[in-house]
Design a protein with these regions (language model features):
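General nucleic-acid-binding
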Residues: 1-16
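Short alpha-helical "recognition helix" segments of helix-turn-helix
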Residues: 58-63
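Short, Lys/Arg-enriched anionic-surface-contact patches
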Residues: 23-43
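Intrinsically disordered, low-complexity basic tails/linkers immediately adjacent to helix-turn-helix/homeobox/MYB/SANT
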Residues: 87-99
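Short, amphipathic alpha-helical "recognition" segments used to contact nucleic acids or chromatin
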Residues: 40-54
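Short, solvent-exposed alpha-helical "recognition" segments
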Residues: 75-88
Length: 99
């Protein structure tokens, strides 16, 4: 199913209207299933570990996940839109690699 452009714009505006971590939590708990929320949280943790300078194998071991999950995160850091690096820097997270 292809998401219409208007629907995506509406979603972007929705996220842009968030003013606090509390509001983020309210929205994410309503918009995602518990499993989806856990998957998104896990992905963000993996991105932070990778950006901190760990190798993919070290990150997989530290996070207790498969190397394929780590590889996907690494690929997004290297070749994605730049959103992960932008927000890592905005939140003053350690970025030893990829940026």
């Amino acid at each position: 199913m292809t998401t219409p452009t208007k629907a995506l714009k509406d979603l972007y505006e929705l996220f842009a209207s968030i003013d606090s971590p509390k509001e983020s939590a309210m929205l994410l708990h309503d918009i995602l299933t518990p499993q989806e929320l856990e998957a998104v949280a896990e992905r963000w943790q993996l991105i932070q570990v990778l950006a901190s300078g760990m190798t993919q194998r070290e990150a997989a071991k530290a996070c207790k996940v498969s190397i394929s999950k780590i590889t996907r995160g690494s690929h997004e850091l290297q070749y994605g839109s730049g959103g992960f690096l932008f927000f890592l820097k905005k939140l003053k997270k350690k970025v030893a690699r990829y940026g």
